[in-house]
Amino acid sequence: MESLSKESYLSSFHQFPSYAPLPDHIKFESVSSKKIQCSALENISPHQYDILQAPNSRALISALKTLQEKICRLELEKTHARDRLTNLTRVAGEHKKVLESEKQSAELAAKEATNQQNDIGKQLNNAKQRCSLLEKQLDYMKEMMENADTQKTTIHEHQMLTQKEQKEIQSKLKKLEVLEKMCTRLSATHKSAETKIQHLEEKLSVEEQNRKALQDKAAQVQTSLEVNRILLSSASAQNSTQRKVKKKKQSKLKNSVSKEPPSKCFYPKAGELPFVAGKSTTSSHSLSANVQNVLHMMKHHSPQVSQKNPKTAEHKPSVLPGGSRTIPTRLISSFTGDNLSDILLALQDELGQMSFEHQELLRHINETKNTDMREDLERELDYVVKQMEIKSDQIMKLKRHQLNVNKLKKTAKLLKEQPRPTSVTKLAADKQNTGAKDPSTPRRKGDLADGSGTPNSKASLELLKSVRKIQMTLKKDDIMWEK
């Protein structure tokens, strides 16, 4: 049993442990160490070991040798491990240094990356700010462009308006030039008309002077003839009685009145006179010339007027206390008052027509939309208003004149209601007074010695008196007509 254990033990020593092959320098070192150990074993003296004397000394020696070899190997391995540890530590230190350097480089790279990121962020912020500024500038530029476009459009519209206004002004200037030319023409025609009117008035004044001279001569001739007739009648009346003389005078008066009724000669209607105020639509001339013309025709018994009025009523003449007949004052009042009433009615009719035209013009102005037509209508309206004012002034003046005429009528009636003198001396005194009051009237009966005269002469005297009163009360500026 002991032998088996020894063999197993020795066999365990004979069996070498498994290990990895060593490198060349380690093999070299192990061989050298083996040689050293073997030499050390060989140097051991045999007397130092009792094992050599044992029966299994060879096995023991071999086992010891193997142990020594194993120990050597272990030592070699230990040294190799130490060397490896040192190498590993050195490599680990180098690796550590490399890692530290890499770590430092990574930290530096990270720092640089963070710095770069910060720089990039700052640059981005700056870029954003610049972009916002650029956007604001773009918006401002857009607004500027829009404002410029609007200004261009407004300037263009203003230019168009100015051009239109200039065209309108030019058209108005042309119209003004045309109107100025028309005004110059009208002024020239007005001046020529005024000169013609002046010439006509001068001619009328000359004709009046001639007519007055002829009337004076005719009055003188008539007075001389009447004186001769009265003398002849007085000479023939000495043989006859006074009753026969009165009958003859009455028959003569009746014959004269029946042959020539005074109403037909002196008092035609206002519509049949050669000129009546208020009926003419054209430009009229002065009133004094018209009145003189009418008076001339009435005094001279114009057949033109008497033929146009055949249907006038025959008025019964009033009988004076001396036996002579006169033309009634109602006919004179018809000439003075009725004609004025007709003129007033005509003027009022014209004023009504003008008011109707005024309303029509206002309606047309409200309905029209054209500016030129409206301006023309407004001018016509102003002209109509002026004409209406003129007509109203004319109506007021005529009313005042009518009041004056009515006052004169009343005074004439009061004078005629008084008893008239029958003696020849009183009649002569009255005639002299009338001649002194109105020197322009011809003194037809002033030279009469007798108080007896024809009824036609007395009627003409009274008519002349009344007409002269009207002519003295009328003035040129009392009545104004259209021009």
Curated annotation (Swiss-Prot):
Keywords per UniProt: Centromere, Chromosome, Coiled coil, Cytoplasm, Cytoskeleton, Kinetochore, Microtubule
Keyword Coiled coil: yes
Annotated Basic residues bias: 243-252
Highest taxon, organism lineage: Eukaryota
Coiled coil stretches, renumbered: 94-228, 375-418
UniProt xrefs under InterPro entries: Centrosomal_MT-associated, Cep57_CLD, Cep57_MT-bd_dom
Compartment list: Cytoplasm, Cytoskeleton, Microtubule organizing center, Centrosome; Chromosome, Centromere, Kinetochore; Cytoplasm, Cytoskeleton, Spindle
Xref: Pfam families: Cep57_CLD, Cep57_MT_bd
Compositional bias segments (type: Polar residues): 420-435
Region described as Disordered: spans on this chain: 237-261, 303-325, 416-460
Major subcellular location class: cytoplasm
Any one cellular-component term (Gene Ontology): cytoplasm
Listed GO MF terms: gamma-tubulin binding; identical protein binding; microtubule binding
Subunit structure: Interacts with clip1, mis12, ndc80 and zwint. Interacts with gamma-tubulin.
Protein family (similarity comment): Belongs to the translokin family.
Function: Required for spindle microtubule attachment to both kinetochores and centrosomes. Also functions to tether minus-ends of spindle microtubules to centrosomes. May act by forming ring-like structures around microtubules, or by serving as a cross-linker or scaffold at the attachment site.
Protein name: Centrosomal protein cep57l1
Gene: cep57l1
